[in-house]
């Protein structure tokens, strides 16, 4: 089975001509223009992208051969997926969110914080949410170089350099 990556979630239909409203899971909204086809969660076939329109918070997609609301309604709530081979090459020190979720967080003093369970958008920065499985407590760390000096996918860990009071 190929490894698939989520690039969007179909939140609704748009109009009556088979268009779908998609919430992008990528920081790069124009990502869909680089794709010839995608998969839809729960379906094995490739869906070739027809038209793409942009709204402030969503992307409106249509697929070739799917020109009726009744045909595409079944896709509501499903994820738009790509094959791992379709990944974009990212700049150095930039990571896919899916690759970060599940990594272990440690302070620079080697104190275990927990696993990264979520990445939330807070203003202009993302915030990493680490969860300690023993206490079930969430620790929120701004995802900026000042507090996150190192991320190692190979070691499956994120190093955190918190200021006083940040993790208490």
From Swiss-Prot:
Superkingdom, natural source: Bacteria
GO CC entries: cytoplasm; ribosome
Domain PRC barrel: 92-166
InterPro entries referenced in this protein's UniProt entry, alphabetically: PRC_barrel-like_sf, PRC_RimM, RimM, RimM_N, RimM_N_sf, Transl_B-barrel_sf
SUPFAM superfamilies per the UniProt record, alphabetical: PRC-barrel domain (SSF50346), Translation proteins (SSF50447)
Keywords assigned by UniProt, alphabetized: Chaperone, Cytoplasm, Ribosome biogenesis, rRNA processing
Family: Belongs to the RimM family.
Assembly and binders: Binds ribosomal protein uS19.
Recorded domain comment: The PRC barrel domain binds ribosomal protein uS19.
Protein's job: An accessory protein needed during the final step in the assembly of 30S ribosomal subunit, possibly for assembly of the head region. Essential for efficient processing of 16S rRNA. May be needed both before and after RbfA during the maturation of 16S rRNA. It has affinity for free ribosomal 30S subunits but not for 70S ribosomes.
Protein name: Ribosome maturation factor RimM
UniProt source species: Alkaliphilus metalliredigens (strain QYMF)
């Amino acid at each position: 089975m190929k490894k698939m990556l989520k690039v969007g979630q179909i939140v609704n239909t748009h109009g009556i001509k088979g268009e779908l409203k998609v919430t992008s899971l990528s920081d790069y909204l124009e990502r869909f223009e680089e794709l010839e086809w995608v998969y839809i969660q729960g379906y094995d076939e490739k869906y070739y992208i027809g038209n793409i329109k942009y709204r402030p918070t969503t992307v409106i997609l249509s697929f070739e051969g799917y020109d009726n609301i009744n045909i595409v309604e079944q896709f509501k709530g499903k994820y738009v997926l790509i094959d791992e081979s379709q990944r974009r090459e990212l700049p150095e020190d930039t990571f896919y969110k899916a690759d970060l979720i599940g990594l272990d967080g440690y302070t620079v003093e080697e104190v275990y914080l927990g696993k990264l369970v979520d990445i939330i958008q807070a203003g202009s920065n993302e915030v990493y949410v680490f969860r300690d499985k023993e206490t079930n407590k969430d620790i929120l760390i701004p995802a900026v170089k000042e507090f996150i000096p190192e991320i190692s996918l190979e070691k499956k860990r994120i190093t955190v350099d918190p200021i006083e009071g940040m993790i208490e």
